[in-house]
Amino acid sequence: MARASCAWHSLWLLQWTPLFLGPSAVPPVWALNLDSEKFSVYAGPNGSHFGFSVDFHKDKHGSVSIVVGAPRALNASQEETGAVFLCPWKANGGKCNPLLFDLRDETRNLGFQIFQTFKTGQGLGASVVSWNDVIVACAPWQHWNVLEKRDEAEKTPVGGCFLAQLQSGGRAEYSPCRANTMSSVYAESFRGDKRYCEAGFSLAVTQAGELVLGAPGGYFFLGLLARVPIENIISSYRPGTLLWHVSNQRFTYDNSNPVFFDGYRGYSVAVGEFDGDPSTTEYVSGAPTWSWTLGAVEILDSYYQPLHRLHGEQMASYFGHSVAVTDVNGDGRHDLLVGAPLYMESRADRKLAEVGRVYLFLQPKGPQALSTPTLLLTGTQLYGRFGSAIAPLGDLNRDGYNDIAVAAPYGGPSGQGQVLIFLGQSEGLSPRPSQVLDSPFPTGSGFGFSLRGAVDIDDNGYPDLIVGAYGASKVAVYRAQPVVMATVQLMVQDSLNPTLKNCVLDQTKTPVSCFNIQMCVGATGHNIPQKLHLKAELQLDLQKPRQGRRVLLLASQQASLTLSLDLGGRDKPICHTTGAFLRDEADFRDKLSPIVLSLNVSLPPEETGGAPAVVLHGETHVQEQTRIILDCGEDDLCVPQLRLTATAGDSPLLIGADNVLELKIEAANDGEGAYEAELAVHLPPGAHYMRALSNIEGFERLVCTQKKENESRVALCELGNPMKKDTRIGITMLVSVENLEEAGESVSFQLQVRSKNSQNPNSKVVMLPVAIQAEATVELRGNSFPASLVVAAEEGDREQEDLDRWVSRLEHTYELHNIGPGTVNGLRLLIHIPGQSQPSDLLYILDVQPQGGLLCSTQPSPKVDWKLSTPSPSSIRPVHHQRERRQAFLQGPKPGQQDPVLVSCDGSASCTVVECELREMVRGQRAMVTVQVMLGLSSLRQRPQEQFVLQSHAWFNVSSLPYSVPVVSLPSGQARVQTQLLRALEERAIPVWWVLVGVLGGLLLLTLLVLAMWKAGFFKRNRPPLEEDEEEE
């Protein structure tokens, strides 16, 4: 029993469990003639799974209704028994009425046995089918049990079907798997066990009225088919009896072959003609778990002998979940379609994606077996369950080939579901959908879980489609619109002669080369309106941008024309002629490519603003082309002979520098005209085009652009349109090149002269290598602060206040500057300072202060704790620290005096060596070392009359440059810094007579100035007149 329970639950889950999925991609498609805007919607009770199964029903008066199954609907006692609804068709939907059946559990006694039926949870409406006046609705999970004393058959889902005769109101039931065999009979063997049939899980009916039921749980889940004429079911039915005999019912046989175990034969069923005998019917059965879940589809004859057995290609893909039979290629033979909604394909990331697949098997001529699928339709949406349902549609667009609908009930932009329409054709089916219907219901509706087509519900001559969405408990009816088959012709002359100016523009009176364009449009179709309004749009030189069109209409000087055409469905085509002209050759570049003219025909929207009532199909778009006649000889074919030479000079490119490279190029054409000729210079990484000049008068500055081609930059310069025969152009192109650190020892420029000619369009490619080198210039400068120092000997006794009062400090500074362009590694700087900080030395090293990353060491190290002796009253002190009165100092040696003494390390004097290192110095970087020294008092006292020049000396070198290219030279250099030590003269008293002469001279000058002013009347003053004086006057 555990095995039976597990298998039964797997059947239930695959049919009923919805998946909630994320967005998925749908390939772009064009719409055909199912009206996706004006569809009818029928709704059932919430949660009833209304739409789980659907079918059309046409009564004897020709009225069409829709039969809808709702397997989870509640009965009047609020028990979940399921229900079947009949919905009269209306354009705007309408109310659905339930068909009444006896849905009560029943118990009957027959001798020592008690028969029981259990209809709660039976799933009435899981499958429905209509034939003539009869509607068959099945409940595959209806349970049955037989009790006999202490034994029982066990309560199991045998399944059952209900039949409703609409005209007479009669009812009948059919449950082919009911039996009164006790479970003890099956204790040793399950052979022949029909207790788990789930009869009616799938359902089909032949044109003759033979009912075919699939029972995937029959024979202990091998599955079986049961078929019987509907008339026999009705005639054999005995109300009030739970177990009765139905004549002429036939079952498939049990099988002990392990490949059939748990195969679920009868999971899907269909009928068709596959043996070449139209008088017989063959039965198609899907077994999706046959041969350990590989799946199979069988085509059985009337004796249930297998004619064909088709195997799945992938384990657990559920090959055979759905089957459909129709003639898609118009050869008069039925073809087979099989769905495998769990098929997984391997994607680019090597992961498996569950997308679903549909297999098309075209029936060959003669007795050949169906084996290899003719076409594979694979879903594109992850977990969309493409192929869950397949429905023949009939000839949807009236082109002579039957079409099909394939459902992906959990596909679509948000997992709401989709139905894809595939058109039949002579080769089978179109590989891409002609129309995609997106679910109008919320996510999880299962839109497309059930499909039914091939019936004209609105009597317009085109078959319509029912789509069930059980998750939303709704059904949508899509009606097919009439299809207008268009025929379009466009005629234009083969070539245009630009030199033949046979027309004049009205506005500018400019002569132009003109030509005529003729357009013809026709339309035919089944049941189309007598008067048809079409819109025709003509586009000139469509492949060019709107502002670059080479031909325009004469009347409007525009590149497009829209016409309104009125024609009947059976009238002859309507033709219209218009004039156009070729623009002047100076207004465009392209003279070689064809001029493409396009004519597109479409249906304008209705005056109410809605979609048209018909659909336009067929030849709605046509293109023709013409060309411009060229001056290229009798064959009108120009064959250029393009040449190119180039040089780049001898100077290499330097890493780190702002290089400007001058390319000398000569382009020549020794053949016929080269149209749209251009110089193409492929620039290496780091190179940028600046400008290009030519040696042609009036053509000095070339028109060039920089573009990207194949991830590299290329400079394109126009050379003429056309570049005529025997043309020679000298070109100088300037290119900036930088960022060469990773370029290697050279960069290459690829040059070529190209044209748009069809024959021999380009010159040979010239590769121009340019060497790369590394170079750096490092500058060393020195400075002394102060540049000179004046000292003088003082008379009298002074007490020493501090070291700075009596001792002068000096600084020798050396600065390194990398001017570039490259970076240097391993820079080493040596500085020699005279003296080793001994008491007898003239200079005493105080400190070494490096900056800019330098690391320095001193040998010997400065003795910062060395004690100086106290200077005597006759010692000297720097005059720049304190000055009481003006002093004279010695600028240089006077006659009889000695030259200044040079104190440096060039001789045998003892010196201090400062050694500094810098690992890396980039372009523009600076580094500095400051050496602080002070003068030694004892040395100056010993040599009071001497002047000195204090000199330090520095050298530097570089070990390498961090590049794998040749180095021009390694930087090195030296510098010296000098400080002059000057002696001041002794102070002298000013003579008294100098003072007396100065005072007397000043008094004399003042007296003379006063006398001159008196003579000039400066001291005479006049009083201003009073008012009385003015009155007297």
UniProtKB/Swiss-Prot annotation:
It comes from the Eukaryota. Keywords: Calcium, Cell adhesion, Disulfide bond, Glycoprotein, Integrin, Membrane, Metal-binding, Receptor, Repeat, Signal, Transmembrane, Transmembrane helix. Pfam families: FG-GAP (PF01839), Integrin_A_Ig_1 (PF08441), Integrin_A_Ig_2 (PF20805), Integrin_A_Ig_3 (PF20806), Integrin_alpha (PF00357). Ca(2+) 3 binds at D395, D399, Y401, D403. The chain crosses the membrane at residues 989-1014. Residues 32-988 are extracellular. It is a single-pass type I membrane protein. One of its GO terms (biological process) is cell-matrix adhesion. The keyword Transmembrane helix applies. Ca(2+) 1 binds at E273, D275, D277, T280, E282. A motif (GFFKR motif) lies at residues 1017-1021. It is found in: Membrane. This is Integrin alpha-IIb. It comes from Mus musculus. The gene is Itga2b.
